[in-house]
Amino acid sequence: MAQLSNRDIIIRLLKSDLSDYDNLLSLLGMANEVLSEDKELSKKLANKVRFLALRLCSTGDIKYYNLYNQALLFLAQKHKDFDSYLLYVEKDRDPEDRYYQPRRNKIYWLVQKMQRLIDDELDILSISMPPGTGKTTLGEFFISFVMGHYPN
């Protein structure tokens, strides 16, 4: 019997019921499997799992929340996704103590600019914003993210 290629497995998974936990978990597994051969596809699959798992958290089943966090961790570690990192590191904080999630709609644009530094699309990013907008705190998170990926 012929063995299915990774792409065939992914196509079958994408055609399957993606509200099923096992299918989503398998899709995240395939994102990891194809990481070395197709990083862009890997990121798309992981983001798909991330958003579907987040939507399915409304069912009240904790396993979807855990899968959402697994997808965030995968994106933060393997794809150096700063937005995912910010969401992941604060997942266990009390909602009223979180920095990023409540401000995400306002500062997502800045997070994306910082992502361009990580992706080596920018050499320098100059940030000029009024006091109290979160520049320093976001900068501290950014430094911790960079130090985690480049410890030396």
Model segments located where?
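Intrinsically disordered, low-structural-confidence terminal and linker regions
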Residues: 1-43
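Phosphate/NTP-binding elements of NTP-utilizing enzymes
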Residues: 30-40, 47-57, 61-152
